[in-house]
Structures are given as structure tokens and as C-alpha cells.
Amino acid sequence: MIIRTLRSQLRLPKPVYISPPCRYYSTDLEKLKKESDTTESDNSASATGVIDKTHNEVLLYYDHIYPFTTSRNVVKQYLSRFSLPWSTAYDDEKLKQKVWDLSSPLETTAKITEFVPLRRDCGAFVKFKYPPEVPATKFIEEIRENVEKNEQERVNSNILTKLYHQIWRNVPKVYSVKGTPWIEDLRRFPSPKLSVKFEGDPLTEEELYVLFRRYGLINEIEPGATEAFIYFHSTRAAISAKHCITGMVLNGGKTTLHIQFVAIKRSNFLVSLISNHTKIAIPVLIALLATFAVLIFDPIREWFIEYKILHNRKSFDQFKESRWFKYLYIPYRTITGWVYSSYDYIDSQIQEVTGSSCSEEDDSSNGSNIVDGQSVRDLKNESNMFWIERYEKSKQLQLWIMENANTFIIVKGPQGSGKEEFVLEHSLGSDERLNKKVLVLECDQLGKARSDNNLINTTASQLGYFPVFTWTNTVSRFVDLGVQGLTGQKSGLSESKETQIKNMFSLATQAIRKITTNEYNKYVKSVERRNKRLKDDEKIEVLKEEQFLQQHPEAKPIIVLNKYSRRADVSSNDFIPPLVADWASGLVQNNTAHVIFLTADVGSLQLLNDALPNQVFKDISLSDASMSSSRQYVCDVLKVKDTSTLDECLEPLGGRMLDLQSFIRRIKSGESPQQAINEMISQAAELINTFFLNSHHKFGAGDSNWDPSQVWLIMKLLSECDTINYSELVKSPLFKVSKETLEILTTLEKYDLISLKRDKGVLDKISTGRPLFKAAFANIISDLRIWKLYETEYIGRLISLEAAKIQKLEEELEKIYKIGKVDGRIDYVSQKIEASNKKILDLEKQAADVASYTGKPDGKSFLGIKF
């Protein structure tokens, strides 16, 4: 009974029975249109937003006649505003015909007088003209029945449409428009929440429910004095309600409804909790950014690392093996061969007729191809000749790699001994199986980086790590500082350079592993293809990946770590050598790659021992070339046949390649051999004076601070003989058997002053590090002024050591006297003091002799050591 009363109250009254004081929303719009459109010819709904309706016309709303349904998806809402490429079949005329087909059959006099599509809302307003003798309610009910019947027939036409209907139920529906619709194209996208504003008396919650329930399920109604909110279960129902009821006049013209969509602001409890607490939000944001970086950029960087490894040694000779190059090059070579053959034939015929010879012209033309007195072909031949002595070592290196058993190889040798050329050109470059997957890392460049960004860029360049964003380090530091000021704790956004470098090497490990996995996959596919053509009893067994890598060493990349040292040139980068050693040992232990270390620093072997304990390294020691090879090399480059003038000059250079090349350049620049060698010896002597004998020299980070007197003693001993026994050297008061002495000698070896030779791991002999330094030692000692300076300093250092010893003995003697009754110890200490005092007297006499000496120094001895 109550519902009937509400329905009777909400029934739209006919305008003819409205008393004059009552106000109609539609009448107001008509008046506004007449007043504003006096000069306009276009009064359609698209121009005014209002649909005019006359007698015998009904206005209906068809929902869901477009393919895109409006939903809570924001992207789909925006797409509904545009004409998509595949929506050309849904133009206005075709949609109008679709609506007519859905509504048919109708009376013959019925027709569509106006069609207003709403692309955004996926519906359309359709104005029908119906016969006068047919009631409007009956006409509308007939259209609804026809739409339902026609759509049901279409759904049942095949199983696909039926299944689609069961899942989505996107069947068009027809609603009668009760109000005055406002057709707008504002950016007010459909929403299941409607705002109902009352112009006049408000409606109760029950009245709103009766009015809106026919369009769909309602979740909630929030009534108000001037505005009410209705929450529909679906957006489709809200769209239909908004278009059919807005502008509706109720209660005898006392109430007019204005309806609009209201965007629903949904709040997630978890998101709100995180966003409202900075201590939680910032770490979560950082984690999301890190995840994004890993998912997006790490695969790209991994690909670039793979590309660098696979194409690092790509030469023109390898490029010529490409079949595409052969397709182009072979025809070109054939045509040029025909041309040159024709030219040679014509030239030979001319020579037979004229009797002339082109030998002199050929000689002159060949001379034009010589660069600095040497042709390119000669350079190649001479280089091969120079490396004949190391041929066996090169074969040994290749054999170790092909054996594929603990391929952790160390190539040792002094600076300038050609370690890099030996490995890359003569060992790996000469074998087609080994030169296809090579990664070369210049460790010295990593150690020389002065700033964090420079270090990261250098490491990325060495590994092929791209892209790299160094600017994020600066930004992250500022953000971290600001967050620490706000929250009292660090955000963790900024990473230390150690962590960043470690992550880069970890990604390189993944890239290397992927290369080996790809090689294994190729092997598996090839075996499977062969097995398809074989019988079951003849099929080949597919090896496991570890077995495959063990039997195919060429499938693993070769990592060459050039110029490896135990310490970096910049102290802040000292973490790099152990990091590289651990990374390389991991590659070998996981059977992922072959690793070759090239080092001139013998002390770096300790780091490698720590990184790969319980393993015996395979090492190759490269020494200087022999005298005969050096002589032949220089003579071939300089085109000299008489070696008598060079023998004396080449002897100080030994077989050090860098010094030989420097000697050749000096001679080519116009110096005589004697001038060239004298100048090189003078420069080496100046280097020794400045760097090793200068007490004010600034030492590198981690280097043991040697004493100039220690260097002076070693120089005097090595100037007279080729090697020094370590057991004899430690007899000097300046050296003693201790860890400090070994560190000093190792540091001197690092800077190439000396070379240490070990026997079964124990230091045995000491020799000159660079052959040219031996002549430089003699040059310094032969200079009387320099000799007197350093000899006096050397003797003074010995005197100070003896004086310190006497002072220590005197302190002990004083303590003994207080104890008493230890006459034996007193006599022993007294004799020690007397012996040291006698040494001081002898040293002071030697110092006086040195100061008064005016000629060449004679050979003297101290403690049986010649100097």
C-alpha cells in the first residue's frame, strides 16, 4: 500500500494540468533556448544539449550499443571518448540501423525522428514517432519486448555468442526517459555513484529507492536536505538512471532533480598506512625503484656484457669468414684478378718489345711503402721472429686451457716484457677456438679512478655494462641526507661504491653464465636433430651441462685480467684487487670461465692464494728476450747488417722490449747509437735519484717506506754482480730477517728496481728489475759528487744504528748492575758495547776518507760485502 502511494506521488503529471505558479524544468529550458537561439539555425541536441519533443513522440534511452562497456577502469573510460580504428563499424548511421533492427517490427507509421549517440557512455537517445491511435506506454512496451526477443535470437544463434552472453551479459536494454536529459561532453566520466541535487523540496530515502531501483541494484543511499548520494552496484545502472531521471519534475512542480556522476575516491588501508608514515613509505619506495631497475635495466646490461665478450676480439679476418661478406667479396676479388692479370700481360709484352726492366721502378715504389724505414709486412715478420723464443710457452698456455682443469692461470713478468701481447695475440689470437669469447679487463685503470663516478664509469666500460646512471649517486646522497634529517635514519637509497662495483661484477657473472648456457643449448639442439635421423639403439646420449663444459673448453669465455696488482694507485680503491680476485675464483670454481691474470707484482699472488685456497696455480714467467734475439730484432727494424756498432749499445738494454723500442725511436730520430744509449742511461739514473734515493719522496698507499741507504747498498752490490744472495744481504745492519725487510724488497720490486727470485716459495736471489738500471747504477756510482753524497749518508746511517745499539746495551747494563751477581752477562754486554764502539770508530774513519777523497772510489768492504 505504501509503495503504491509513493508511486502515485512520484507519477509525472501532465503539463496541461499544472497550475501557473508551478515551475517546470523543461519549460524553463524551452524559454532559454528561444531567448538565446533567435539567430541560430542549429538547435539540435549536439549543439544545445537538449532534445526537443513534440506530440506523438517518445524519448527512449538504449544502453550498451557500443562495443566498449564503461567500467571502473580509467583507461577504458578515456578510450570510450575516441573513435578507435576498429570502431568504424559503429558510426551513427549504422548504430541507428542497429537500433531500428533491435526494435522491429513496429507499426508502419512509426519511425526514428532523432538519434543522439553517447559514445562516452556507450548508449544513445532515440526519439520515436508513434501512431496517434497507439498509447505511448503500449508503444514503449512493444519496443522493449522486440529488443529482448531479437537480442535473445542473436545470442542463441551460435555457441560462441551464447558463451559470451553467459559470461558478460552485455545485452542492450531500453528505458523511458522521464526527465529532461542534459547531453554534455564534459570530462565527467561515468561512475556508480550519483549525486542527486534537489531544486525545491527534497525526497526521502524511500522515495529515492522507488525512483531509482528500476535501473539496477542499489548498494547505498545517503539522503540529504539539498543533495543525496546513490551508490549503484554497477556503473551501467548509474548511467541509465542519470540519463533517464535528470531534469525530472516531481510533487506538482515543487521538486526538480539534477543528477551528476561523482567520482569514487577509493582508499586502500595498506596504501594509506604506507603513505602516511615516512619511515615506512621511503623504504617501500626504494624497494619498488630497485625492483623496477632490476626488471628493466639488468636484462639490457646483461645483453651488452654478453655482446662485449662475444665481439671484443672481432677482427677483419674473422669478419671475412661471414658468408655475406663472401657473397660480396669473392666476385670483387675475381674481377680485380682479371684486371691485374690483363695489366701484367700488357706490361710483359711492352717489356719484350722495348727490352726495359721495371725492377728499379719497383724498388722505388717499394720504398714508398716503408714507414720509418720499415714496411708493414716486415714489421709483422720481425714481430713473429721476436716471439719465437716464447712459442713453447704459448703452446703451454693453450694446452692448459684445452685441458680445462682448474684454468686459473697467472702470467708473470716485469713491466715491458710483453705479457699482454703474449696472451692476446700469440696465445689466444692464434687459435680460432679460443679467440671468439674473450673479455679483457684493465685492472690498473680501475685502480687509478679518482672519484666514485669515474670508478663506476671505468668499470662499466671495461665490462660492457650499459646503461649506467652515475648522476643517481649524487641525487641519492642528497635524498638520503634529507630523509635522515626528517626521520632520523638513513633511507638506504645511496649505495657505497663497493656495493655498486660488486653488483656490476655479479651481473657480469650472470652474463658469462648465460653465454655458456647458450652454447650448451646449441649442443643439445644439434644432438636432438641428429638423433631424429638415427635408430633408437644408435642415438647419442645428451651430456649434462657440467659434463659438456668439461669436455668443451672452447664453450667457456676467457677472462683476461691485465696489469693486476695487490694495491690500487688510489688508496680508496684498494678493495678492487681482492674483489676481482674473488670474482675470478668464483668463475673458475663454478666452471663458468677460464681466467688468466697478467701481473708484474709478485706480491699480488698472496691475494690470489686467499681467493682460491687449496689450489695450485698454473703460472708462466716471462723474462726478457735473449741478447741474440734483441740484436736481430733491432737490426731488422733499422735495416742494419753490421752489428759491431750496436753490440756495445744493446748490452745495457738487455731484452726489455720497451727499452729496445725506445732505442730504435731515438736512432730513427737522428741520434747515433752511442748517444741514444747514453741518454737513456742518464734518464734512468735521474729517475733512480729522484724516486728511490730521495728521502722526501712521497710513497704510494700501502708501500713500505724504504730507506735511501738501503737502496744505495743494493745499487752498489748489483753494479758489481748480476744477482745478490738474500742470505748475504740480511747480514747488513740495514737489513735483517723480518717481515719488514720482505715488504721493503717487495715494494722495490713493484717499482721495477729489483727482481726477486724464489726457490720453492722462499726468497733466494735478488737481481736488477730492469736491465737498463744496472748501467744506471754504475753511472750514479761513477759520479764522484753523487757517490760522496750517498756514501756519506750510508755510513752515517750505519753509525746511527750502532749508536742506537750501544744505547740499548747501556740501558741493559744499568739494569744488570742494580740486580748484581750476573758477572757473565755483564762481561757479554760490555764486549758488545766495545765491538759496536770499534765499528763506529771505523765508520767515522771511512766517512772522513770519503769526504777527503778526490779520485775514483776504490773497492772497499764492510762486513765482507763489497761496495
UniProtKB/Swiss-Prot annotation:
Residues 26-279 are mitochondrial matrix. One of its GO terms (cellular component) is mitochondrial inner membrane. Pfam families: RNA12. One of its GO terms (biological process) is mitochondrial genome maintenance. Residues 301-867 are mitochondrial intermembrane. GO terms for molecular function: RNA binding. Keywords: Coiled coil, Membrane, Mitochondrion, Mitochondrion inner membrane, mRNA processing, RNA-binding, Transit peptide, Transmembrane, Transmembrane helix. It comes from the Eukaryota. The chain crosses the membrane at residues 280-300. Belongs to the YME2 family. Plays a role in maintaining the mitochondrial genome and in controlling the mtDNA escape. Involved in the regulation of mtDNA nucleotide structure and number. May have a dispensable role in early maturation of pre-rRNA. This is Mitochondrial escape protein 2. It comes from Candida albicans (strain SC5314 / ATCC MYA-2876) (Yeast).
